[in-house]
Amino acid sequence: MSETINTSAQFPTFEKPTVQFNEKGWGPCELPDTFKDVPYQPFSKNDRLGKICDWTNTSNNDKKYQNKYASSFGTGIQYSYYHEEDETTFHLVDTARVQKPPHQRGRFRNMRNSRSGRGRNARGGINTHGMTTLSGKNVKARDPRRGMGKKFGNRGPPPKMRESSVAVRSDWASIEEMDFPRLIKLSLPNIKEGVDIATCGTLEYYDKTYDRINVKNEKPLQKIDRIVHTVTTTDDPVIRRLSKTVGNVFATDAILATIMCSTRSNYSWDIVIEKVGDKIFMDKRDHTEFDLLTVNETSVEPPTDDDSSCNSPRNLAIEATFINHNFSQQVLKTGDQEAKFKFEESNPFISEDEDIQVASVGYRYKKWELGSDIVLVARCEHDGVLQTPSGEPQFMSIKALNEWDSKMANGVEWRQKLDTQRGAVLANELRNNACKLAKWTVQAVLAGSDQLKLGYVSRINPRDHSRHVILGTQQFKPHEFATQINLSMDNAWGILRCIIDLVMKQRDGKYLIMKDPNKPIIRLYDIPDNTFDSDDSDDGEGDDGEGFQQVYNYANNSNKI
């Protein structure tokens, strides 16, 4: 029997698939019809696959949500499927802590917290009964999409823009810009103590009973009816006389302190400089806020600019100036029967026939050699004198710090801390009024004062800015206090010398240096010679026709404060 093989059987054939060739890139050139209009859910390989797509994300054109086109990785996890374990295999476990021997208790506690970074005292977490939970700050950090509004400046109030002390005019030419980081690096060492050229005025002796004042034994601040002169450089008759024979740079201690402590200032200020030949005269503009004492200038939250409030920067400055002048006169022994210390010359700003009560101020005109044939002549001031047991007088600079509202100033309560923690009160004042305290220290060093007396004056009621009490006093040696507040006199002299050298290189004329109100920069401008001439007044001219700046009677102006 033979078998026959059928060779005509049909075998399955192989059909070659169509492969699309993309000449310009890789991947398919066109999308098949079967895959068109199929929604697609973005995903990450790190996410668990819980669904194919999300039909709830409808498109909208609401501009309120600026981050709707951001990455959507991980947004569908809340809809994911989670496999629940069988609870029949669950068993209770005894979690009671085994009591350790005394020598092993707390053995690795500090090491564990410091290494893991998740302990109670470590950064990044709070340990609560063995459970480590992230703090609120770090919880927000886990989601990179949170806080985008604050990051791009869409939330929060805009930065406060301060006004300039003087409006820059179009005909002023900017010569130089000096930023604070560069000024801080300047240094002019080995400047010797100033030499006295002339001494004027009369000083009263300090009343030591004010050293025993404390919070429980406070004393009301009185309103002293005395006149305080604030005469600028070119209106000083003594400087006019000395400029003919001595020095080539002339200024006052207030002007020098403003320049030397410029790197600590936040508010805007300006000083007019006039160059005549090889001589420079530094002046302040008349009837400005240059002589007012700032309050909380360097604070993290300075006073708000509300002119209707008694706690606005200007009203606080007037109040601080009023307190400072009254305190410096109240702590002195006044009266016709009390002894007084008289300098060689009388007060140069009053005539002999004038019957007015002038504040106790001693003027000391000194000169300094700054090198390169630069001789500085300045008028410095003393506020009082102290009689020592040896009989030698010690000259004093008397200033007052004032408390206006500790809650608004982010400070400490003076009535609670001043007697027990005076260092904390002073440290808080150094943070809030660093520039003002530095100026006072520089003025005391320039004048050669033996003591810097600081008084602590507070409001009787935080809402009443017209009545104050003295809560205590404190004294320092100026050079030691400068070291304590990290004030370098070498740097202060270097800043002054830098500005003098810049002006010396210019032609004769009038210039102005101004602190930028919003940037740590000092600018030098070349201004026309007739600038600010229209602001001068003829009030208070002396007998010789020399126009002095108007004197301020702070006691009579107390109602305006």
Curated annotation (Swiss-Prot):
| Disordered: annotated span | 98-165
Biased segments, Basic residues type: 100-121
Q: Give the family per the record.
A: Belongs to the eIF-3 subunit D family.
Which GO molecular function entries does the Swiss-Prot or TrEMBL record give? mRNA cap binding; translation initiation factor activity
Report which gene this protein is encoded by: eIF3d1
Q: Major location, coarse class?
A: cytoplasm
HAMAP family given for it?
eIF3d
Q: What interactions and quaternary structure are annotated?
A: Component of the eukaryotic translation initiation factor 3 (eIF-3) complex. The eIF-3 complex interacts with pix.
Function, as annotated, reads: mRNA cap-binding component of the eukaryotic translation initiation factor 3 (eIF-3) complex, which is involved in protein synthesis of a specialized repertoire of mRNAs and, together with other initiation factors, stimulates binding of mRNA and methionyl-tRNAi to the 40S ribosome. The eIF-3 complex specifically targets and initiates translation of a subset of mRNAs involved in cell proliferation. In the eIF-3 complex, eif3d specifically recognizes and binds the 7-methylguanosine cap of a subset of mRNAs.
Q: Which residues carry this modification: Phosphothreonine?
A: T128
Q: Where is this region: RNA gate?
A: 289-303
Q: Which UniProt keywords apply?
A: Cytoplasm, Initiation factor, Phosphoprotein, Protein biosynthesis, RNA-binding
Its domain description in UniProt is: The RNA gate region regulates mRNA cap recognition to prevent promiscuous mRNA-binding before assembly of eif3d into the full eukaryotic translation initiation factor 3 (eIF-3) complex.
Tell me where it resides.
Cytoplasm
Return any one Pfam family short name. Answer: eIF-3_zeta
Gene Ontology biological process terms in this record = cap-dependent translational initiation; formation of cytoplasmic translation initiation complex; regulation of translational initiation
Protein name as catalogued:
Eukaryotic translation initiation factor 3 subunit D-1
Gene Ontology CC terms, in alphabetical order: eukaryotic 43S preinitiation complex; eukaryotic 48S preinitiation complex; eukaryotic translation initiation factor 3 complex; nucleus
